[in-house]
Amino acid sequence: MTRDIGKRLQQLKARRSGTDRMAVLNSTDGLDVLAKSIYGESYTRRATGQKHTQYALGAMQAVDADYTRISLAEAERVGKQLDAGLRARGRDVGFRLQGSVPCDIHIRGVSDVDLLVLDEAFFTYDTSGSRARAGQFNSPVAYTPLSALQSLRSGAESILKDKFPQAKVDTSGAKAIKLSGGSLRRPVDVVPSHWHDTSDSQVTWRETDRGVRILDKSIPESVLNMPFRHIERINQRDAQARYGLKKAIRLLKNVKADAIEEGAKIPLPSFDIASVMWHADLGALAAGSVYELAIVAEAVRHLDYLARNAAHAKTLLVPDGSRPIFNTAEKFEALIQLSLEMDDLAVQIGREQDRLLHHVQPSLRQVEEVLRRSVVPN
């Protein structure tokens, strides 16, 4: 498969600036995105003449804070309309965000934001938890949680169509109602759900230990997620890694996106990519606070090790501890493909940083050593 670094740099710029998703923007915001895209980001003025290095530097960076602010503001705006509409129907709801945007590991300037709409009238719980065993949960509701979520979804769909008449309200998804266009400056995914008190949260009383059950209307059933624990644990390890973990996650997500554009099949979800790097060497990632390309080196080493040690890889859990990362054979095959993509990128960066590598077919270990000691001028 041919890897075109010039094309990948263009695609990276389009993703980060939002010009890749003009179709979901209204005309005013489309013009704003186009205008802002004319001015290159700081990474485009570094490593000039070293395209692979420049790509890695850009792929690791957080999306412009102004883009993220707009995404969060639009989610809040949608939440306010839903809150008013649902309360008028006698429903008490709460709102939280989940996913890549609140975790700051999104790679698109125009990113969908996941807005949880939580039915506050009830919650479910682990019957093995301490509060449940003590008999503290003794006021059952007269309806099933699943029927409540189905009703919540129906009400939310109706309200969104009424409050955002010019927007596209896509209700075909199993878990999310997707809004885009019209007066919305960014796409918002509305996810009907309710709280679930886990055994842990019954002890700690911390919201990050609470789960949420999300409606999957295609079955129908509710699915337990732990989005707040996931975000907290990514944030904790990122701080321990001197903010190198999130850079590594963004890098892998960008490489995956560009490889797919070129025809590769890498069915490894963003959640699992973050989970993979959560298990990387934090000290090696922390070195990226001085030697930025050390983050590339650790991502390459870590993926290569897992790809060569399937038995170990399959023991690794997602950060919230709810399941193995590689719970399907397809995901492990995707890891191998992503590892090969990273190997190729690392070799090309290594050759840009050390001319001696032009004359040999270097081993990955040689490439990693070059990346760990390379300094890219600002």
Stretch-by-stretch model annotation:
Residues M1-R96, P102-V110, F122-S139, L317-R323, ...:
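N-terminal regions immediately upstream of nucleotidyltransferase
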Residues D92-C103, K163-G173:
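A short acidic/basic microdomain associated with nuclease active sites
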Residues L72, E76, A142-Y305, R372-P377:
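Catalytic cores of NTP-dependent nucleotidyl/adenyl transfer enzymes across multiple folds
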Residues R133-S147, R210-M226, R308-S322, P362-Q366:
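Short secondary-structure transition/capping segments
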Residues N254, A259-G263, L268-P269, D281-N378:
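Terminal, contiguous helix-loop blocks that mediate binding/assembly
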Residues S100-E120, K178-V191:
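Histidine-centered divalent-metal-coordination microenvironment in nucleic-acid enzymes
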Residues L115-F123, S147, R153:
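Internal, well-ordered alpha/beta segment that forms a basic, Gly-enriched binding/recognition surface
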Residues D29-Y39, R108-V117, V203-V212, F228-I234:
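Short, mixed-charge, low-aromatic patches
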